[in-house]
Regions:
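Bacterial N-terminal signal peptides that target proteins for export
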Residues: 1-11
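Sec/Tat signal peptide C-region and signal peptidase I cleavage site
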Residues: 20-26
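A conserved helix-loop-strand patch within extracytoplasmic ligand-binding domains
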Residues: 102-157
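Short, polar/charged alpha-helical segment
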Residues: 39-58
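Bacterial N-terminal signal peptides
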Residues: 9-19
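Ligand-binding pocket segment of bilobal, Venus flytrap-like solute-binding proteins
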Residues: 73, 80-83, 156-197
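Pocket-flanking alpha-helical
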Residues: 45, 63-101, 195
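Short, well-ordered beta-strand elements
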Residues: 27-40, 58-63, 151-156
Length: 197
């Protein structure tokens, strides 16, 4: 009898929540989501789109593009939701718009995501590479020869058009690495994944 009461109570609670949810869903309308051309953004956008469509009955429209035009559309109110972005790449544009209350940051969905120049542990240990400045050496650059420009090493960068491509280009110049390395554009997110795997 106790089990039956628990099941009945849970059913009533579930039914009331469903009723509340259904009445809330009626006013959902259209949700305009942004998506980018990298895998983690794709999965985050797909999950949010699924929840909005199937959980709240929203009509979902997804617009895919690169950071600059997508964020400009978001700032202008043409897009409602951006599920993932690389904040460090857009601070100068993002902060004033957020401070003005035009957009709201709801938190971090992928903690500890970092942008940096990486070298595998074996190579770093063997050549005592502890800082990006240790890469500023022609003998070290020769370890990473760029097949398209054998006079330099290759630093695999982001895709041309991604903000981080420009960030990496500037970092190479500031650190003096452009004398020894190319800022290699792998051409696609999949090729970038393969290059760093």
């Amino acid at each position: 009898m106790k089990i039956l009461k628990k099941v009945l109570a849970l059913s009533v609670i579930s039914l009331s929540l469903s009723t509340f949810s259904l009445s809330a869903n009626a006013d959902c309308g259209k949700a305009r989501l942004a998506d980018f051309d990298w895998s983690s953004a794709n999965i985050h956008t797909a999950i949010v789109a699924f929840i909005l469509e199937h959980g709240y009955g929203c009509e979902v429209e997804v617009t895919k593009g690169s950071t600059t035009p997508i964020m400009a559309a978001h700032y202008d109110g043409q897009l409602d939701i951006v599920t993932e972005l690389w904040y460090d790449n857009i601070i100068a544009n993002y902060d004033p718009v957020e401070a003005a209350g035009v957009i709201r940051n709801l938190g971090i969905n992928t903690p500890d995501s970092q942008q940096a120049f990486y070298v595998d542990r074996t190579t770093a240990d063997k050549y005592d590479l502890k800082s990006v400045l240790d890469m500023n050496n022609p003998e070290i650059a020769a370890l990473f020869t760029d097949p398209e420009d054998p006079s330099k090493g290759r630093m695999t960068s982001c895709i041309s058009g991604w903000t981080c491509y420009t960030v990496n280009y500037v970092k190479q110049r500031v650190y003096g690495l452009d004398n020894f390395y190319t800022n290699f554009d792998p051409g696609s997110g999949g090729a970038l994944d393969a290059a760093i795997a």
